[in-house]
Amino acid sequence: MITVRDLRAERGDTTVLEGLSLRIADGEFLVIAGANGSGKTTLVRQFNGLLDPESGSVSVDGVDVAEGPVAARTSVGMVFQNPRDCFVGAVVGADVAFGPENLGLDREEIDRRVGAALEAVGMADHRGTRIDRLSGGQQARVAIAGALAMEPDHLVLDEPFTGLDHPARRSVRRRLEALSAEGTSVIVVTHDLREVSDLADRIVVISGGTVALETDSPADERLAEFGVRPC
């Protein structure tokens, strides 16, 4: 479970989040929506200690992220909106293997995870390809594969479908749905509910620095009040 309590966060001199509280259950498929600049990305980067709050707290499975950032980064997989922020290797297979290698797994298990992750995003044939030779959409899929290979308890994806073609979107959607069914928390940050509306257990809208709306219906007409188009 991820628990956010009375969170306050700043970007420069601007307060982005103020008094935000949120609880995300194991296995929940949560969509975080809101206008550009509302603080969605600032919020999710608190989940594994990439950003520190000014006040309040974030805990992952009962451990305060500020006190155990390494544990949080192991438990919370993160896929950034710009996939280039994720890459640490020049070749697809080496990049996806980086996370599992740092978990101290044996080579057989690492190879299994890398193969399964690349298969899930339709990139199994590109294991030996240099990342800089891939299209933007292919790079996005490699970034998702890198997070999947960690087999985290909680997976955060910031605009994960940007640049993906329809077959890749279907493949990624199927994998995310399966992960949620298996007990992994899946948190998707998006401006387009149509991508995941049928998968979401709950939709949270961030506005005014806090949770302005929670709903389990993508057709909820109140979404439009916050610049989110109902489905």
List each language-model region with its residue ranges.
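Helix-to-loop junction immediately C-terminal to a conserved catalytic motif
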Residues: 48
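Conserved ABC transporter NBD signature motif
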Residues: 56-67, 72
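Conserved ABC ATPase "signature" region
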Residues: 107-126
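ABC ATPase C-loop
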Residues: 147-149
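Catalytic Walker B motif of ABC-type/P-loop ATPase nucleotide-binding domains
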Residues: 155-158
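H-loop/switch region of ABC-family ATPase nucleotide-binding domains
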Residues: 190-191
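A short, surface-exposed alpha-helical micro-motif characterized by mixed small hydrophobic
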Residues: 196-198
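Conserved beta-strand-loop-alpha-helix hinge in the C-terminal portion
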Residues: 210-231
